[in-house]
Amino acid sequence: MNRASLEKNPHEVASMFDGVARRYDLTNTVLSLGQDRFWRRATREALQLSPADKVLDLAAGTAVSTVELASSGAWCVAADFSVGMLAAGASRRVPKVAGDATRLPFDDGVFDAVTISFGLRNVVDFSAGLREMARVTRPGGRLVVCEFSTPTNGLFSTVYKEYLMKALPAMATAVSSNPDAYVYLAESIRAWPDQRALARRIEAAGWSDVRWRNLTGGIVALHAATKP
């Protein structure tokens, strides 16, 4: 299986990410034109972490995002359902756990904060995933979802869609070990809810005080929420 369908069979999606793990970080930096570093930093800042916090970084992949979070001094664990991705990040000295976002291997209320970056689109039932994130977060704890979204400027949105469907696959062919995975990426972004619709889904999953902030003109949005 080289490319997961938008039906998101969990085993196929995990296999797809296993296949791109070796060059995943480099590919992301190239395809985002270096914006991935800014997005990781913005996610950390939105969580407002302290050294006393316990943080779950879900869909952490190679744990590059977890290392960014841990720079705050908080205790952070990387979780991902792609064993290949976790293995590719073996040199990063943070705790790592293999796990499914809809069945997390953690007790209730053990985390002060939970975050997921560019992974919610890949969860077979992302509303169930959001509920599971709420389960493992203590009352008053924080959620930050960093995800591709909908550009707010009409002209920019048109240019971005052209990039997604034409330029991105061509660039992925040059730098990725599995270019088909990035065709799936483009298609899944186009099918994803916009900022307001995602905020409603987060609230429906049991989170409160849901708000969002656009990054890079709305290419990415940070949704933040609180566990009641």
Curated annotation (Swiss-Prot):
It comes from the Bacteria. Transmembrane segments: none annotated. The keyword Cytoplasm does not apply. GO terms for molecular function: demethylmenaquinone methyltransferase activity. S-adenosyl-L-methionine binds at residues 62, 80, 100-101, 117. Methyltransferase required for the conversion of demethylmenaquinol (DMKH2) to menaquinol (MKH2). Belongs to the class I-like SAM-binding methyltransferase superfamily. MenG/UbiE family. This is Demethylmenaquinone methyltransferase. It comes from Mycolicibacterium gilvum (strain PYR-GCK) (Mycobacterium gilvum (strain PYR-GCK)).
